[in-house]
Amino acid sequence: MKLKDTLNLGKTAFPMRAGLPTKEPVWQKEWEDAKLYQRRQELNEGKPHFVLHDGPPYANGNIHVGHAMNHISKDIIIRSKSMSGFNAPYIPGWDTHGLPIEQVLAKQGVKRKEMDLVEYLKLCREYALSQVYKQRDDFKRLGMSGDWENLYVTLTPDYEAAQIRVFGEMANKGYIYRGAKPVYWSWSSESALAEAEIEYHDLVSTSLYYANKVKDGKGILDTDTYIVVWTTTPFTITASRGLTVGADIDYVLVQPAGETRKFVVAAELLTSLSEKFGWADVQVLATYRGQELNHIVTEHPWDTAVDELVILGDHVTTDSGTGIVHTAPGFGEDDYNVGIANGLEVAVTVDERGIMMANAGPEFEGQFYDKVVPTVIEKLGNLLLAQEEISHSYPFDWRTKKPIIWRAVPQWFASVSKFRQEILDAIDKVKFHTEWGKVRLYNMIRDRGDWVISRQRAWGVPLPIFYAEDGTAIMTAETIEHVAQLFEVHGSSIWWERDAKDLLPEGFTHPGSPNGEFKKETDIMDVWFDSGSSWNGVLVNRPNLTYPADLYLEGSDQYRGWFNSSLITSVANHGVAPYKQILSQGFALDGKGEKMSKSLGNTIAPSDVEKQFGAEILRLWVTSVDSSNDVRISMDILSQVSETYRKIRNTLRFLIANTSDFNPAQDTVAYDELRSVDKYMTIRFNQLVKTIRDAYADFEFLTIYKALVNFINVDLSAFYLDFAKDVVYIEGAKSLERRQMQTVFYDILVKITKLLTPILPHTAEEIWSYLEFETEDFVQLSELPEAQTFANQEEILDTWAAFMDFRGQAQKALEEARNAKVIGKSLEAHLTVYQNEVVKTLLEAVNSNVAQLLIVSELTIVEGPAPEAALSFEDVAFTVERATGEVCDRCRRIDPTTAERSYQAVICDHCASIVEENFAEAVAEGFEEK
């Protein structure tokens, strides 16, 4: 036997290298085979519900790192709630209708207009489901736990029927109407868009300054006067029917030198406009308030059949332009509102493809709207005063990335204005985890217009509306419920398979159809109505869920998307928000803080992270960032997270190895019998337990990460485990001192593994497989530990906080001695402490082997003044010299009792007593040489 064999060197097969990329899929299959999700649900049956409702990602393409961050966050919450006394089911969902899928099929060569619509929709459905299953596998690879066999998908018959019923209730309450308001119109998609389908980019446009000649000045202005107008959309002049001024803005009538014409502009802008137009020696002839100009009539710049009326509008400002805007009610929301209020014609001169129509005039007909500037300039002639290129923020179709226009077309709307206050009141009852989130959603609802819910596309849920022979729209409770029942059995494709009369209740009649003939609506619903109905399609319809949900968690862009549409439909139907809490996240940016883009080549695919690091590192990264704001991710950042993971893993490996001979049922030492330092570490660990439990409850992942890493690096690695080897390796295997420390080790190991499970389930299960005395076969089936408190806890914490200060001062003294070449390692030191009453009281309270805690071979405590050569730090003085004696071959301390024993071992008296007591046979035979 060799002397080293008398040491209790921890042994474990738990590998230092995690091998996550190859091991994770194996563990995930094991969990699936063991039906862990179902078993967890069974364990939680009867407990209070916590329902996190999954906002459905769009079923197209592989998941990106933003998806990963969002879904890992959801998984951490679901797992932590499931292990904290809640019944927390997770039903993943997917959004499957809409234009992107039609665009994919078009790229694949599918010609929609050349094939049967039902067959086309079948192709859309097949493609959408293929994407659902692909993304499902992507999410499962992240280590997510959920009901993967009972997903919710917006194209299933039960979901579509639930959506129709949401629409029906809104129709019954009078919230659905048809109108010809201007809407966001995407010529590139040939469809109306909702606000949530718009994104803003900078666009360079030609702006024109031109003049309308006064035709009837109402006794205020003469007919040789021109009102100066500014526009950034020259094509809309073809539909201009008025000029809008601000009622309280001051306007001036001016005449520049050399001009026979007189002009009206905003007084505040006269100086800048004079410079822009090249006016000199401008004479101000009169000043008017905007309201004085109301109902003056001007000529259209070139259309002699059209007069343009001066009207008042609150949207007019003097921030730019001339303080006067031309008004085309068919091409703008503000224009429409003031135009309708003043009886202006709603003219639309652009078709669905962005092409100018015949009513724009023969010079314009057939031109693309954005190419008509030269023609407009030609038509304006000497009425054009200036033109310039401006860069401004402009709405784009979020899918095609093309600019859109406002365009008045007949559409179906949900009248938000009819129940706006009810929605705002509902927002006040929701808990927002970021106050700005509440303000943002509140302001969006307060300021938004009615919701355009119709789309001129094919792949979606049909609007369940019929038309009588006289054109009357039919959407009664009876007809809508009948359609819902048909969809429930056959799916929405039946709408296209059957004639209108076969979709109506048997024997249905309507006074507007004396011949019994009916037509059906061909528009489909906005996809935001699809996902915005999920509270009904999922929460209400599934018995293991609750409505409203406890939590909606999505990216901050969903304040204008899913949070918004779900809120509107839920309040419209039931008067309540569909969620009790909202937690939003920022976007994942690259390492430089730039937006990720395939064109920039700075994207990071979750699959690439899984191959290089493992999903576990991605999960840990999610907790290492403040996801309420935009966050950064790169392979370098993930490498740093991987290093943190390595430290966590190796620390826990040390605990596994050094409890391998510990049977908790037999070897645990009661708290009251622990040493002071062990009590301290137990208390500190329970503080960590409370911090982490509270942070899980509040969804504060970064708090968990910081607290965990700090505990492992500072409390364990830099202190407790730093001197632990002198106990667990050196002392007798069954000695009280060793068992005391092992008791703490094992308690920390078991509980920290449970605490890590929601974040690092793969690693936690791997550790758990080495804990043979734990009864649950999977740690995921256990409960999170409860934080304990102990007698005299605060007193113990205060004592050890003071000792940590003392220890820090001692370490400074040792470092100075090391720099002076007095010692090398701290174990070579003889440390003398010149104590005062404070230090004396402290060390008595610590009641531990202080030399062991400081990792020095010899410690002397002297009462009285320190010599001049002593090193003083704050109010403690030290001297450091090399310890006397020889190095013990067993404990590596320098000890004056170290000597060669009769059994061929050069060891100190303390080690000799341990060896002689526990290894009598080896002592009798003598130890082998090293």
UniProtKB/Swiss-Prot annotation:
GO molecular function, one term: tRNA binding
Enzyme Commission number(s): 6.1.1.5
Binding site for L-isoleucyl-5'-AMP: E554
Superkingdom assignment: Bacteria
Task of the protein: Catalyzes the attachment of isoleucine to tRNA(Ile). As IleRS can inadvertently accommodate and process structurally similar amino acids such as valine, to avoid such errors it has two additional distinct tRNA(Ile)-dependent editing activities. One activity is designated as 'pretransfer' editing and involves the hydrolysis of activated Val-AMP. The other activity is designated 'posttransfer' editing and involves deacylation of mischarged Val-tRNA(Ile).
Written domain comment of the UniProt record: IleRS has two distinct active sites: one for aminoacylation and one for editing. The misactivated valine is translocated from the active site to the editing site, which sterically excludes the correctly activated isoleucine. The single editing site contains two valyl binding pockets, one specific for each substrate (Val-AMP or Val-tRNA(Ile)).
Protein's name in the database: Isoleucine--tRNA ligase
Gene: ileS
